[in-house]
Each structure stands twice: as C-alpha cells, then as structure tokens.
C-alpha cells in the first residue's frame, strides 16, 4: 500500500535554508575530489572513455547496508539487496550533499526518481522534508521501501512503483524543491530526459542532485535548463548539485 505524504509544515525554502548559515553561497564552487570510495554495488560501467574492465573494478560493489546520516532517523540502517544494478549513494557523498543543502529541510518537497534503497529521499525526510516521493521500478525494492517506511512511521514519504522520468513529467512547474537523479550508470539515455523533466518541475530556488560516472559540464546542462552549482568526485562517482540555469546566474541573497 502506498503511503501518503504528511501535512506540510511551514515551508522553509532552499534559499531560506542556505541563508540561515549566514554565508553567501557561490554560484559555482570549485570541484571537490575525495579519495576513492569504499566498494559498493555497481549499476553499470562508466562511459566508454574508461575501459570496461577498469570501470567494473572502480565502481561501488556489494550488498549489506547503508545508514541514514542525520536527522530524526540518524543511524537507521537501510538494507542493500544484492541486486544487479543497485548502487546506493556512498555515505560520505550523502554527507557532503546534505552539508551543501543544510541540515534542516523543513517543508521541502522532494522526489527521488530512481529510489533504489531510498537512501537519498529518506535522508531528506529524516531532516524535515514535508513531502518525499520515492519512485522505483523493481517490485522487490518497492516492497522493501514500503516495509521500511512503515517501520519508521514515515508519514511524509510516499513510495510508488513506476518510471521516475514519467513521474517527473507529471509534476507541476515549481512543485519540487529538490529532485534526486541517480539512474543506472550504464543507461546513458536516461540522464538528459530526467534532468530536463526535473528542471521543468523545479521551484525557482530549487536544486537537482545528479549522480553519474563522469562530470557533467554547463555546456551539457544549460540546454536542459540547468547549471552546475557544486561538484565532487568520490572514486568512480561524480556528484553534482544543480540549479536552474537562470537562478544559477544569481548569487544566493545574504540573510
């Protein structure tokens, strides 16, 4: 049974969350490079520029579990099924991402288009997001997400089996504060349509999180309506925080 999103608290916009830090956020920060991540499960090979044998060795491998890093469910364990293509976002990448976004996501509206273990969306819900939609195609993972949300009493989280890109396209303009885009690395045809659909649904000061096997540049992103805000590399994983191309040209206002 799909769980419905809870009643939203007074919304705190992404811009407001950043302003509480008392610091200006640069339009584009310098890329951060982290040492290679501990092995986890790979969803696929990195682009053809990297030999397949090298890619298979470099990408995260393995099942086991990951943990929610912050918020009300801090240290909660999330099972990682031994399923071909399942590649949860490494803990330290999620930690950096939510340091960028801020620890308090009170009122945010989120969509995790390729949910998998649900780590990204549940991390947002743990930090106060008002509505989180987890979209996943695999029936087994959907059942696992339903059970997990029931155990956590995660009333703000809805789990839906389906196509993440189609779900993004159904979102009204301005209805999302963040979209998490983390498709299987080998399915390169998914990236551009997902990013374009996310941009169309994004609130003016919202964000898109993109995880990929290689870095995306503004030359690739701007035609899709987005621009790079932050980037880091952790082993074979490239994490990008994106904003709407028009919004990225404007620095975040000071408090």
Predicted features along the sequence, with ranges:
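Class I S-adenosyl-L-methionine-dependent methyltransferase catalytic core
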Residues: 1-255
């Amino acid at each position: 049974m799909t769980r419905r999103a809870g009643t939203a608290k007074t919304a705190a916009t992404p811009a407001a969350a950043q302003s509480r830090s008392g610091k200006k956020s640069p339009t584009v920060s310098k890329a951060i490079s982290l040492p290679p991540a501990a092995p986890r499960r790979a969803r696929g090979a990195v682009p053809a520029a990297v030999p397949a044998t090298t890619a298979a060795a470099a990408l995260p491998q393995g099942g086991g579990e990951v943990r929610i890093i912050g918020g009300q469910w801090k240290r909660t364990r999330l099972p990682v099924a031994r399923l071909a293509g399942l590649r949860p976002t490494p803990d330290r990448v999620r930690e950096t991402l939510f340091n960028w976004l801020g620890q308090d996501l009170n009122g945010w509206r989120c969509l995790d288009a390729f949910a998998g273990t649900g780590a990204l969306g549940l991390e947002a819900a743990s930090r106060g997001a008002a509505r989180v939609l987890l979209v996943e195609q695999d029936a087994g993972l959907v059942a696992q997400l339903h059970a997990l949300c029931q155990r956590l009493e995660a009333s703000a989280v809805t789990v839906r089996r389906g196509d993440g890109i189609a779900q993004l396209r159904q979102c009204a303009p301005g209805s999302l504060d963040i979209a998490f885009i983390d498709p299987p690395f080998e399915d390169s045809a998914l990236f551009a349509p997902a990013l374009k659909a996310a941009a169309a649904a994004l609130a003016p000061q919202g964000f898109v999180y993109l995880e990929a096997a290689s870095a995306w540049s503004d030359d690739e992103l701007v035609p899709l309506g987005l621009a790079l805000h932050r980037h880091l590399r952790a082993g074979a994983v490239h994490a990008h925080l994106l904003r709407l191309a028009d919004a990225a040209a404007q620095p975040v206002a000071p408090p």
